[in-house]
Amino acid sequence: MAMFPLQSALLPDEDLPMQIFEPRYTALVRDCMRDDDPRFGVVLISQGREVGGGDVRCDVGTVARITECLDLAGSGRFMLRCRTGERIRVCDWLPDDPYPRAMVQAWPDEPGEPVTADQLEELEDRVMALFERIAAARNVLLPDRALVLGSDADTVDPGLRLYALASRVPIGPADRYSVLAAPSAAERLAALSDAVDSVAAVIEFQLSE
């Protein structure tokens, strides 16, 4: 699969707007657009940068499907709108030709301890409290819970709900990757819980200064 390493960790079911200008990635776009289902894999760069190569890449990512492609004629650039889908795991990195490529496999959630509705609600309460603390510090009104936490709060699959919740919390790439790379829903719950605690601690420290 064609791969696009990024400096952010994309979770399933997220929008991904992109401006493509580096020659190897414009080649990737052209190759993808020849398919009926244009898509590529996205993974987090653990070291290095997106431009120029020489990066060190993580091995867990998501599939990004191109939903809109605008060829900026004469500029050598593309504007893309993509939507991330299923989680993937890299089995083997192939030589860049000219863009990164890898053998990948779909990686659905592995069996584990069930995540209960009470556990999800408790985590959602903590996320809501986090946003309420930020809003109070900035003296702004917070939208209602459904808008803050997402209209997909009734999602039956706890693993998918945790992805959706994580996408709304202001956590960094490393924490987002921990959420993405958690093998099971229960481990994802633990990873996101730790990330929320870390963000809350940072915010309290900043507000105390």
Go through each PLM region and give its residues:
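N-terminal low-complexity, acidic/polar interaction/targeting segments
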Residues: 1-209
